[in-house]
Amino acid sequence: MPTPEPEKPANPTLHAVIRKVFAAAEKGFSLDVDFTAAAGFTVIFGPSGSGKTTLLDCVSGLTTPQAGRIAIAGRVLFDASNQTNVPVAKRSVGYVFQDLALFPHLTVEQNAQYGLAQLPRPQRRERVAALLRDFRIDHLSRRRPTEVSGGERQRVALARVLVTDPCALLLDEPLAALDAATKSKIIDDLRRWNEAHRIPILYVTHSREEVIALGERVLVMENGRIIAQGTPHQVLSAPLQETVAQLAGFENIFDATVWLTHEDRGTLTCRLPTGQPSGFVLLETPLIRAEPGSRVRVGIRAGDILLATVKPEGLSARNVIAGQLVSLERRDMMISARVNCGVEMEVHLTLASRDALQLTPGREVWLVIKTYSCHLMQR
């Protein structure tokens, strides 16, 4: 008689303390994290090589930490202190890899049934049919993976994992290879499924759009450590670390020195060095606790900068900076303009703005930057 699966708790929480050091001959890398993931989406966000996949591998059991503890709703999967290490097959943790690894000789329905051999056939078919409906691929049940689209194959992979009724779900960049429209539809399906089932879902991505669309909570990783966490708005809107700022879409990041503090009006004046003798750009930023002479980093999103071809007046924005247009580069339906104003800044424009302003390299322009578009970060 097959061993019954552990009963899934009504509202599980995943807690993990993981310490893993790889030898230099392997990765020369260490993972050191401590986090809690409640039922729902927790997005693991960070640059390549930051340890996102290694974290998932440790939770799944594919990689064994040297120290730490991993538990879901109190059920301990790993505990180095007493040598507990539940095998992968008994953890009841679903894992969808970047490589979908569907069986090409099996139909969509057969692929989805693969992990249910212990169930009677009628029960298998009923459970699979429900998942295929949830992910809108029930009409493809008799087709093979080579006969469906990339987005449909991804839905099959999700159904195959979820049909086993896991206590937690690990998703390693599952939508990376898909176009934006297909990605959006699958995200909608995942969100709808999650609303009904509410298990901890760790979702690895490089995409800021996916963080915003899916993330109830986001953990940002760098060099095997969690460097920021919170809601997407908390983490991405005003980042405190340069790595987070880059991931959050702050294209302009500069070294600066606090020159003046204006406590009466809640601002600082910062100096950005230009690389020229005695040259600098002045930038008014929000007030923080910093003494004149302190070194800071300033981040500005390219989409938060206005560009004018005549010097504007009568504005609430505190920063109006003259410069010269260096280049214009079309990126899909957007223009990336680079402007030299002592430091080089990137500005994002619409195609219509470029045409209306008759912009060409070499033209004199002015950049308009609001004080609260300037974010100060740790150095």
Regions found by a protein language model. Give the residues of each.
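ABC ATPase NBD coupling module
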Residues: L77-G94, Q118-R121, R125-E126, P239
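Internal alpha/beta loop-helix hairpins
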Residues: E195, T205-G275
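Glycine/charge-rich catalytic "coupling/switch" loops of P-loop NTPases
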Residues: Q276-E329, H348-R379
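Conserved ABC ATPase "signature" region
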Residues: R75-A80, Q123-L140, R191-R192
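A short, proline-enriched helix->beta-strand linker immediately N-terminal to the Walker B motif
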Residues: V163-C167
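Conserved ABC ATPase signature
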Residues: R144-V148, E152
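Short coil-to-helix segment of the ABC ATPase nucleotide-binding domain corresponding to the Q-loop/switch region
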Residues: L106-Q113
